[in-house]
Amino acid sequence: MRDEVESPEELLGLARSGPVALLVVGDPMQATTHIDLEDRCVDEGIGFHVIPGLTATALAVSLSGLQSYRFGRQVTIPFSVGEYLPTSPLQMIRDNRDSGLHTLVLLDLDPTGMGVEEPRPMVPGEAVALLERMSQRSEGD
């Protein structure tokens, strides 16, 4: 279904001729894909109604017991694919720390970087190793 939402011509065609429902887990407006779909509906005069849901990120912040307004930007630690290893996640964590803010760190689910294999959750030890590599890379720049 992801392809149909990211390239929504068929979905929009159905919506032009009758009611269509798209059910997603969590808050749909936290995904740029769903924001794009909403924008297309507005542009084409297609009526829509969004019912926000509870997101895993909001739940994680709530369950942490920390004050939600003390969180900075959330960060995703991506798997390293080939030579690809961005240092921006580490920099965002540092920026949040320097501003006295907590960081909600999400761990990647796609070891291929292309969505061609079954999702595999990154484990915390992998995330730590990747952060260490990011640190070494950023020191070398």
What are these regions (language model features)?
Residues M1, P52-G53:
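Short beta->alpha connector loops at strand-helix junctions that form conserved
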Residues M1-D3, G26-D27, S80-E83:
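Short, flexible loop segments at the rims of nucleotide/cofactor-binding pockets, characterized by
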Residues M1-L11:
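Glycine-rich, highly charged phosphate/nucleotide-binding loops
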Residues E4-V5, D27-Q30, A56-T57:
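A short acidic, glycine/proline-enriched capping/turn motif at secondary-structure boundaries
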Residues E10-L12, R16-A21, T32, D39, ...:
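Beta-strand/loop-alpha-helix module characteristic of Rossmann-like adenine-cofactor folds
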Residues V24-D27, P52:
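Glycine-rich beta-strand-to-loop/alpha-helix junction loops that act as flexible
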Residues D27-Q30, H34-D43:
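Active-site/ligand-binding-proximal alpha/beta "capping" segment
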